[in-house]
Amino acid sequence: MSDLAHQRRQRLIGIALMCGAVALFACLDTTAKYLNTRMDSLEIAWARYTAAFVLTLIVSNPLTHKGLLRTKRLTLQITRSVLLAASSVLNFVALRWLQLDEALSIIFTFPFIVAIAAGPLLGEWIGWRRWAAICCGFGGVLLITRPGFGGMHPAAFLSLAATICYGFYAVITRIVSRVDSNQISLFYANFIGALVMLPVIPFVWTTPDNWLIALMLMGTGILGSAGHFLLIAGHRIAPASVLSPFVYTQLIWVVILGYLVFDNVPNRWTMAGATMVIGSGLYLLYRERKLGKATTSEGVVEGPLE
């Protein structure tokens, strides 16, 4: 097999892994939205991180892989983990009232937050073309939410807050990836996420009604962990610039699942706004690729909020 054919094959496998990852994340959001009718959103988020942490212990076993606990940027690891946990909680709470496609369309603006924050935090300043794309993208968010016009539920602002938290999490992840591996970052994200929510769990705990609900609750951690595993695996064999556009295929899955599970159909405002957001995000990727700033690194894995 020629080098070119091998590279093409690796990229196709990477794309398949990315599409599989976002499909699992769509299933996670669907499960969380369903469980929201049975229990508190904090309990769902805590179960998601606790189950993922247990899986990390089983797969990685820090007793035999002691490097898993050794981070050179402990403060930043804690900060990014708290931001990720906060984004998950806010997203799950928002899903109590929003349709899956509505919440995801807002979350798709996280690359804009990254682009804005990367200037002061990473020294990666953006030009007027990308500023225009960001403004267009946030215009799409206004079209989706329609504030002041009796549009979407105010919970949309929780999705926006979740997106901001996730954007700063992604920027800090870029910083720690220079010295820590993905495995270390994933371990701390799951551990800190479960730990920070633990004190409030006794006050919001609801025992699952039956074994199916209990399995779904544990399944949130499995879906999240499996999705991140596919995400990391895809970035190891294909450039981020090739994989990133396929993040947006998650919208296809949430529209299908939203209809099948909740009988939700996207309205024209959501679809029009989502088109603006996705188009602006793809243009940002195009500009970064053209300017040579889109890099492939095992330590930099950015994907959907989960």
Positions of the model-derived regions?
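Hydrophobic transmembrane alpha-helices of multi-pass small-molecule transport proteins
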Residues: 129-145, 269-288
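Transmembrane alpha-helices of multi-pass small-molecule transport proteins
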Residues: 38-86, 165-168, 188-204
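Hydrophobic/small/kink-forming positions within alpha-helical transmembrane segments
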Residues: 22-27, 57, 81-89, 111-116, ...
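Loop-to-transmembrane-helix transition segments
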Residues: 13-19, 60, 65-90, 154-162, ...
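Membrane-interface helix-cap regions at the ends of transmembrane helices
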Residues: 3-5, 53-72, 138-151, 193-213, ...
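C-terminal transmembrane-helix exit sites in multi-pass transporters
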Residues: 91-93, 111-132, 252-271
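Transmembrane alpha-helical segments that form core, pore/gating elements
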Residues: 33, 41, 56, 149-209, ...
